[in-house]
Regions:
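Non-Sec secretion/translocation targeting segments of pathogen effectors
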Residues: 19-28
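Active-site-adjacent alpha/beta core region of enzyme catalytic domains
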Residues: 41, 116-246, 299-340
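Solvent-exposed loop/turn segments at secondary-structure junctions
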Residues: 46-50, 78-80, 159, 219, ...
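A short, basic/flexible loop-to-alpha-helix module at the beginning of a structural domain
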Residues: 30-34
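Terminal low-complexity/disordered tails
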Residues: 234-239, 245-307, 328-352
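Patatin-like phospholipase
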Residues: 35-43, 48-136, 164-177, 181-188
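Bacterial N-terminal signal peptides
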Residues: 7-18
Length: 352
């Protein structure tokens, strides 16, 4: 019995000496260090012919020095076009004055032509313009040519209505679908392909996604394309100091019939009389995805700001003949306005 007690005592002493030598018993497992917080990210939603509204807000952000440390951009549809323009401007390849001149010089015929009253329209003029401006003037041929990491959202037409539909085509490999070697014009044509109105587009040489037709990413789950930011943060192990979500104004009255008339379709005002308003739906979707961001990434939401015009004038979504007036109206409105913190925006339910 004494021998057993002595052996047990020696074992306990040895264990104590070992613990002391190793610094004592280990405490709770340490949490991994928080990723560094730095840089600014932009999220630019779709806008169709209201593209100059977003451009004017982006110029105002730049003038106020809020894009000095711009590190990532995510956009879809017209927001994708503005994302590429910001790349050109921040890198010194183009000025805001030149970009505004391009927008103000556009007309419907520079974007689409229509045979009779058939939909979708022919967007070959848009492709020609993008090749001239994006490839020729800005010097961007592939996604990898963009100096700022940039994601452009697209979706498959057959996937519309499903939950997971977005493909976030980034200039850097942050996800499975990104391929920096792809044509930037092809991706822009897909991202601006408004379902029904504009034809779906195919992207040449794809290997990371199916070789099929694609449409506007904003028509799927990326109505507010913020998730690319989460993917970029995870891939680069960082957190952005600030995020600005820039969008366009939503009109407050039904204008479906007027939009259709611009495309040669006369519904005799039926949709407007019924009060059918895609604008109200768009506003609800905007708030829905902002609320989703707040729930999904509360830390990021605390550092996110929303800027969306709210002036008196109304402009049609498919009227590319009024871009100059839109730029001027938004620029004037922005002088007395500032981006609103996301949580404040949601609490005030700023839905036009």
């Amino acid at each position: 019995m004494k021998q057993r007690f002595l052996a047990f005592s020696l074992f306990c002493m040895a264990l104590v000496f070992r613990l002391v030598a190793e610094g004592g018993p280990s405490g709770p497992a340490e949490l991994p260090p928080a990723p560094p917080v730095r840089g600014v990210a932009l999220v630019i939603t779709g806008a169709a012919a209201r593209i100059p509204q977003e451009a004017a807000l982006l110029e105002a952000l730049d003038e106020r020095g809020l894009l000095k440390d711009l590190s990532f951009i995510s956009g879809d549809s017209s927001g994708a076009l503005n994302a590429v323009a910001v790349n050109a401007i921040v890198s010194g390849r183009m000025t805001w004055a030149r970009y505004r001149q391009i927008l103000e010089g556009l007309h419907n015929s520079d974007v689409f032509v229509q045979s009779g009253k058939r939909l979708p329209v022919d967007t070959s003029p848009l492709r020609a313009m993008l090749k001239r401006v994006v490839e020729g003037e800005m010097g961007f041929r592939t996604m990898g040519d963009l100096p700022i990491p940039t994601s452009i959202s697209i979706t498959r037409l057959e996937d519309l209505g499903l939950e997971k539909t977005a493909y976030r085509m980034c200039s850097e490999r942050i996800n499975a679908e990104s391929d920096p070697s792809l044509s930037i014009v092809d991706i822009l044509m897909a991202s601006t392909a408004i379902p029904v109105v504009f034809p779906a587009a195919r992207i040449a040489g794809v290997t990371t996604i199916k070789d099929i037709d694609y449409v506007d990413g904003g028509a799927g789950e990326d109505y507010v394309p913020y998730e690319a930011i989460l993917e970029f943060e995870a891939a680069r192990n960082l957190a952005f100091e600030k995020v600005f979500i820039v969008s366009r104004k939503s009109n407050t009255v039904p204008e479906v019939s007027e939009e259709l008339r611009a495309l040669g379709v006369n519904d005799r005002g039926l949709f407007d009389k019924l009060g059918i308003s895609p604008e109200r739906l768009a506003s609800r979707l905007f708030l829905k995805y902002l609320a989703q961001l707040a729930r999904q990434a509360p830390g990021l939401a605390d550092r996110t700001f929303v800027w969306r015009p709210d002036f008196q004038a109304s402009f049609l979504l498919l009227d590319f003949n009024s871009l100059g007036a839109q730029y001027a109206a938004t620029q004037e409105w922005a002088q007395a306005s500032a981006p609103v913190p996301l949580l404040q925006y949601l609490s005030e339910a700023r839905s036009p």
